Amino acid sequence: MSENTSPSIAAVRDLREASCSPIGAPTVTNDLSENVILTSLDDLHNWARLSSLWPLLYGTACCFIEFAALLGSRFDFDRFGLVPRSSPRQADLLIVAGTVTMKMAPALVRLYEQMPEPKYVIAMGACTITGGMFSADSTTAVRGVDKLIPVDLYLPGCPPRPEAIFDAVIKLRKKVGDESLAERRKHQQTHRYVTVSHQMKRVEPVVNGSYLRAESQKAALAAAPAGQTLATDAAVLTPAAEPLES
């Protein structure tokens, strides 16, 4: 081939080097490069918020004792930037730990309404999430705090260990880091929760001593052999104490 139609080896080498690194080396000095950060507004805003969550501690029962263990030197609660606040107007994270009763429900809702946006809620413990062991017999326990305020993260356990609380905080930090300012403004009005004037529905008391006459007892009577009856008196069900031998 002629020289006009076939490029030289040196020209091909120069073209390959130019295509592999089409942009030259930056002219920014080392001192200046360590002081310049290229980021977006969402990333900068989310990084500042997830690194300095200020919780409002709402502890009503034994779950809060596990949370109090985080304040010691063994778990180092402050390394996540969490600074407990005593005023809801200075907090952006509400940690509900323990049973929520009908009488305390308006106070909890008022605390949530006084917190500035954006705000988050962690439901800690079985009693907070579903009512726990008080959901069957108690007439004053709220069956889930999400019936009062929106919950961002559920932390099951009875009670949860301090390591589980750390895991919940880490997951909440990831959620905060993935948020967008534009999307949060769109979905902010979709969060619905009751107000302090909400009338709680009360149920009939079930602690009346009639457990032996419940549906489960009726099923046991139906399954019993013919001619055999089950005792329905608590005194009969309680075994008598055996006499002591002298």
Swiss-Prot record:
It catalyses: a plastoquinone + NADH + (n+1) H(+)(in) = a plastoquinol + NAD(+) + n H(+)(out); a plastoquinone + NADPH + (n+1) H(+)(in) = a plastoquinol + NADP(+) + n H(+)(out). It comes from Synechococcus sp. (strain CC9605). GO terms for molecular function: 4 iron, 4 sulfur cluster binding; iron ion binding; NADH dehydrogenase (ubiquinone) activity; quinone binding. Its EC number is 7.1.1.-. Keywords: 4Fe-4S, Iron, Iron-sulfur, Membrane, Metal-binding, NAD, NADP, Plastoquinone, Quinone, Thylakoid, Translocase, Transport. NDH-1 can be composed of about 15 different subunits; different subcomplexes with different compositions have been identified which probably have different functions. NDH-1 shuttles electrons from an unknown electron donor, via FMN and iron-sulfur (Fe-S) centers, to quinones in the respiratory and/or the photosynthetic chain. The immediate electron acceptor for the enzyme in this species is believed to be plastoquinone. Couples the redox reaction to proton translocation, and thus conserves the redox energy in a proton gradient. Cyanobacterial NDH-1 also plays a role in inorganic carbon-concentration. Belongs to the complex I 20 kDa subunit family. It is an enzyme of class 7 (translocase). This is NAD(P)H-quinone oxidoreductase subunit K. The lineage of its organism: Bacteria, Bacillati, Cyanobacteriota, Cyanophyceae, Synechococcales. One of its GO terms (cellular component) is respiratory chain complex I. The keyword Hydrolase does not apply. Its cofactor is [4Fe-4S] cluster. Binds 1 [4Fe-4S] cluster. It is a peripheral membrane protein. Its main location: membrane. It comes from the Bacteria. GO terms for biological process: aerobic respiration; electron transport coupled proton transport; photosynthesis, light reaction. It is found in: Cellular thylakoid membrane. [4Fe-4S] cluster binds at C62, C63, C127, C158.
